[in-house]
Structure formats: C-alpha cells, structure tokens
A protein has these predicted regions:
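Beta->alpha turn/N-cap motifs
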Residues: 92-97, 157, 187, 204-209, ...
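Bacterial N-terminal signal peptides that target proteins for export
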Residues: 1-12
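Short, polar/charged alpha-helical segment
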Residues: 44-60, 165-173, 212, 275, ...
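N-terminal signal peptide c-region/cleavage motif recognized by signal peptidases
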Residues: 14-22
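An extracytoplasmic/periplasmic, membrane-proximal ligand-sensing/linker region
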Residues: 29-31, 174-175, 214, 240, ...
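N-terminal (or domain-start) structured segment
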Residues: 22-113, 152, 160, 176-205, ...
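A ligand-binding cleft/hinge motif common to bilobed small-molecule-binding domains
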Residues: 97-106, 170-174, 201-235
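Hinge/capping helix and adjacent helix->loop/strand transition within the periplasmic-binding protein
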Residues: 82-88, 102-189, 238, 251-284
Length: 323
C-alpha cells in the first residue's frame, strides 16, 4: 500500500513537472500584451512597438501594445502588478518604475518586490545644455559660475519630479552647487524659455535638443551618461568633463509580474536580446539617440536595485514629491 502511494505521488510530481516544462516550451501560445504608461508616438512607445513587432514575428503570436498613460505611469504599472503571473502581460517601463515609489505617497507597489526584471532594453542619453549667451563654455566653468551666483543659477525642467529635475538634484550634490529649479508643464515650454534666454540651462533629452544644438541655438556642455552619445560624438560625458561616475539616463525596460516562472522570464529576455542584435533594429534605435542594451534578467535586477538606492537618496534629500 505504501509503495503504491509513493508511486502515485511520484507520478503526480512527474506530471506536474512535465506540464510546467510544456508550458515554458510552448510559450507563448496566445497573444501577449505590452502595457506602457506613455502615450502613443513617444520614444518609449516607438521602442515598444518595434520590439513588439519583432517578438510577434519570432513567436508567431500577436503582441499587442496598450498605452495606459496617467498618474506618472502608475496606472499601467498597477495593471501589470495585478495581472496573472504567466508572462502574457508585460510592462514596458521607464525610470518611473524605479523612482515613483519615492515620488508618490500612494504607490503601493515596489519594483523589487512586485515586479520581476526581464530586460533593460535601451538607455536614452540626457545632455546638459545652456543658452549660448551663458558665460561658461564647459562643465568646470558652469560649476564655477553656479557657485558664484547667489542662490545658484536657474535651471529649467519639464516638471517637478521629471527626469530633468532628478538629474539636476543629483548634479547639485555631485558638483557641490546650489540651484533654483524652475519647473515647467512639459519639455517644450521649458525649451522655449531656454531658447529665449529666460533661463540659462537645463538637462534635456539628446533627441529633443539636437536640432537646436545643430542650429547653434543651444550649447551642449556634457552628456549625463557613462558613454558618449552617437548623435553628439564630440560632446564629453560628465566623467570626462570632471564628474567621475555621474550617470542619469532615460530607460526603456520590460518587466513582468513577480511570480512569473523564471523559465518564461529567461525566454522573453533572450528573445529580446536576439532582436536587439538585428542590424536594422539597432540602426533604428541608435538613430533615435538610444543606447542599445538588452540585458539579462539578473543584470537588470541588479541595475534596478542600484538605481533605486541612488534615486531614493536623491529624492529624499531634496524632499521631492510629485503628488
């Protein structure tokens, strides 16, 4: 009797293991949803649709991009956190999944607890730009100018808690300067006042600043990434300009609900990495001013933890709240 019971249990375990293996091998066998918190037409949306189309071609299953903007991407993130843990609902994230738990008092999720890292797809370079009439011509000169100015220089950003604002706060700490933050309702109004000379300096995405840089209407000082931008190859990094290790970048990522099977996560990540190696995909992303990454889940998980520690410290020290 005991032997029969043991054989029965063994057979049951084998069946469960086989079923789990089959689920992983067959993934995906139905449509996959890519949820993002940004509107259609923006850089993150373009990355999502490009990668989504390539995944669809590779998998032979529909990959549907769903834009759910609002509340600083919290709506989209909450949807994915609460979705079935099967890999069929994925989040196309940004740096907001890392910083929002510190910026918003009503965020109930934590990226390290409620989401699992799949892939860091791309990094978007940020450039420190100034109006050409600003006396400083390089980073050291700008830091000296900021220190000499009572209350610091005025810095524009796309809004309170925006990437530009957070980068400014990190820069203030790293450079040992003070600054007056001037938040706008979006990038375009901030750029308009920068171009008009009403504010002297700001951190902005390379892509949005590039036309004005080429036209001589803005002067690039340094990029806030660890590598130079291929769109601005002559502009130094912050490290090269005198602030070692300084990094602030935009992100396009893929995350899944915590509890998603590791085998499914590994498959999705590996397929994304393979897609990002395709020359036509790389060329399109680089042409958008993006740095192609395609990390493993472990690499991305480590990055999320490091960035959470860094930005949490910056946000708390500056007392920034977005709600």
């Amino acid at each position: 009797m005991r032997r029969a019971w043991s054989r029965g249990i063994g057979a049951l375990i084998a069946c469960v293991a086989f079923a789990a293996s089959a689920q992983t091998t067959d993934f995906p066998n139905k449509p996959v949803r890519l949820i993002l918190g940004q509107p259609a037409g923006g850089p993150t949306d373009i990355v999502a649709r490009l990668v989504g189309q390539k995944l669809q071609d590779r998998w032979g299953q529909p990959v549907v991009v769903e834009n759910r903007p609002g509340a600083g991407s919290n709506i989209a993130t909450d949807m994915v956190v609460k979705a079935p843990k099967d890999g069929y609902t994925l989040l196309v994230g940004t740096v907001q999944q890392i910083v929002n738990p510190f910026l918003f008092s009503n965020v109930a999720w934590d990226p390290s607890r409620d989401l699992v890292a799949v892939s860091l797809v791309t990094k978007a370079h940020i450039v420190l730009v100034e109006h050409p009439d600003t006396p400083a011509k390089d980073l050291k000169g700008l830091i000296a100018l900021a220190k000499a100015e009572k209350g610091g220089l005025s810095w524009a950003s796309a809004g309170n808690g925006s990437t530009g604002h957070l980068t400014l706060e990190l820069f203030k700490t790293s450079a040992g300067i003070d600054a007056t933050h001037v938040p706008y309702k979006g990038t375009q109004p901030a750029l308009a006042d920068l171009l008009g000379g009403r504010v002297p300096v700001m951190f902005d995405g390379v892509v949005t600043s590039l036309p004005h840089i080429k036209a001589g209407k803005l002067r690039p000082i340094a990029v806030a990434s660890l590598t130079r931008s291929q769109l601005l190859p002559d502009v130094p990094t912050m490290t090269e300009a005198g602030l070692p290790g300084f990094e602030a970048v935009g992100l396009a990522t893929v995350m899944a609900p915590a509890g998603t099977r590791p085998e499914v996560v590994a498959k999705i990540s590996a397929d994304i990495a393979a897609i990002l190696k395709q020359p036509e995909v790389r060329d399109q992303l680089v042409g958008m001013g993006l740095e192609v990454v395609g990390s493993s889940p472990a690499e991305f998980d480590s990055y999320v933890k490091d960035e959470s520690a860094k930005w949490g410290k910056v946000i708390k020290a500056a007392g920034i709240k977005a709600d």
